Amino acid sequence: MLILMLRSALFAFVGLAFFGWWVVADPSFEESASQSEWSYVLAFSGVILLLAFAVPTLAQLVGGRLAFRVSIVAAAGATLSSVANIFEDGLQMSWVFFVFILGAAFMQLGLLALTGVIAFSGRGGYRLLALVPAGTIAAIILFVVAGGPIMLATWLTAAMLALALSTRTPAQAARATP
């Protein structure tokens, strides 16, 4: 029961942290002076790094080795982007932008693959969890316009689904599968 609560708390924290950063930082398509302030750099890197922990935790909830392995790709991409952001914006090493983009690409591809794995191999209500990586992809693509609210809704939904689905036994989940 404690693991269930911690998992749900992590999911809720990801959504709240991302939304909080998005509101405070007020991202734009233009480069801003605050973008390279250490507080913003570290906060943004921290929010990205949260995904590296949350995505594999989500995959464990779904179950199966394939889901977990695919989630590691997304987590590695998030970690790479997080570290690259510190060098790019914090230390003003502009060439590291390409490393940031590479990490973001791995993260997006991993999330896309995870969406497919959950949707096609998940059982019963656990298929609903495919909405979480899909929503995360949408939040990243629409980052400037609506990334914070989308991420908040996505990961709060993950927290609620984690609580709701974990109260069902595997036999109940199997019976609910069409």
Residue ranges with predicted function:
Residues 1-178:
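Hydrophobic, aromatic-enriched alpha-helical segments typical of multi-pass transmembrane helices
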